[in-house]
Amino acid sequence: MVQSEYDVVTHFETLYQRADAEFAFEAETREAWLAWQSAFRSRLREALGLDIIAANLEGYVPAAEQVGREDRGDHVRESWRLWVEPTVPLPFYLLRPKSPPTSGDLPLVLTPHGHGRPYMYVGIFHTEEERKKLEVGERDIAVQAVRQGYLALAPTTRAFGDTRTVADKEADRIHSCRTQLVRDLLVGRTPIGDRVWDISRLIDWALKALPVDADRIAITGNSGGGTVSLFAAACDTRIGVAVPSSYFCTFTGSIGAMRHCGCNYVPGILRMGEMYDVAGLIAPRPFCAIAGEEDPIFPIEHAREAFSHLKRVYEVAGVPERCQLYVGDGGHRYYKDGAWPFVRRYFDVLIS
């Protein structure tokens, strides 16, 4: 039907319906599921720009430098930089438990942050507003991890902190995501791809430099950190447990329905699959999506819809119990009660 007046919602909902996703999950057997994963993961890596980065940096080995150390009582907080690209010294924090519950290699948890200050995930705040945001939203995620007895890596998300533009640093803007997006697009890359690349290089480094149990690697972060958690686990199968918070939803019901930061977007993603299809690349590894009942930007009804689709992937994989949705009673924030019991359960299984 031809409309007499333009309506932006109707127009784009029509486009979404016509996207005809190539990798919409339809497998009924284990063999078909594995073939779907292999083909989709390869295509997703290409779309994110990971293949371009890998080709441009073939043979490159990142160097690391420690720049600080502080005793925090029950753990040690170290500051590091890792040259994830020759032109990108990426800051990150390493938190080490002083009294781990077991001897030998330790589990590793990566805690990518979202649209906030990188230091908040390690419990640092500089203003009363930051303190309240950290405490109410349970955003000291790396500290939570190290207090579970795990090694924790809290990287700066690309386009934040020291990886902002000079102008954004001078103006004390939180991020430079738009600059990252538009310049990445010129060379076939994406901010999500950059951030997934960084996570994989941190895992490379940790496995060589730290006493890490390679079978017990988890990733969890809130909002934009949930984005990185989901896509990194979809692309890098070394990540054994994925717990994205305040992100898992449908693309059409969240970033396709309201204003979101440009760093969330991957060109043509709906022609490949919905968010639950991307998350399906994590199966059979344990996956728990944390959501807020009152989250205004990743609405719970669309999170539940996405979860119903994702459960089907885990059913075909033969492990439906490994796919969970935890719903907190608040808004867009982290809910630690949805994270650590789930992580512990599967870390314990992996050593039993």
Predicted regions: what is each one?
Residues 282, 289-291:
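Short beta-strand/loop motif that positions the catalytic acidic residue
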Residues 179, 183-186, 201, 239-280, ...:
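Mobile cap/lid helix-loop segments that gate and shape the active-site cleft of serine hydrolases
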